[in-house]
């Protein structure tokens, strides 16, 4: 009998451990604003189902031609493994991580309308703030306030996260850009010359120009957000990151900037992810 009880206890312990593990859910949101369905992945921390607690939310944006899976897939960001390591070590709090999909409409494969900004016929930024965030706050136990939200991203998503935090500083407490696509020197009036519409939308939504032209009131709002950025020393975007950092310093908006050994690849971004998780809700 003692052996049976011991065996049953072992089974129940394993079941409880499995139920308590972190997981990634894939959701489909029917957007009235976009007139389309959009996918997103959501990481839920260990114990979410049983704790009854509310959690802070990190919105984590993928890069150009990436997907909602980029940050959590093996060989990509490997978020579940890294998040569990950081949380277990006490370096980051338990959090929900939302990874939206910004691939546009054309069979959801990218290209046309890809990106995080409103363009004609595809108001993605409007969808993000008027539909996605409210949907997440309604479906999950979130801390639905500025102190409970952060945003981060890589490359195109890094630029998107910075612009979102600039325009919606009341929504996010922190912003982290890794290898951010923060500006372009292309001609703003001729997107066809480069054949890629999303680069044109980036050029028209420059975070560097935003800071340069910001009013004193807008600069004060920027100071209500904690800013951090990094880039590889051999990354082709390091110069534009330096320009943004210089402009933020000129405007006296505090920002941390790290240039590390690396290029524009997943090795660099995986190494950045622990710092993203630590920084997002640092006390």
Question: Where on the chain are the PLM-derived regions?
Answer:
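Non-catalytic cap/lid and distal C-terminal segments of serine-dependent acyl enzymes
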Residues: 21-283
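Positively charged n-region of N-terminal signal peptides that target proteins for export
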Residues: 1-4
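Bacterial N-terminal signal peptides
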Residues: 6-16
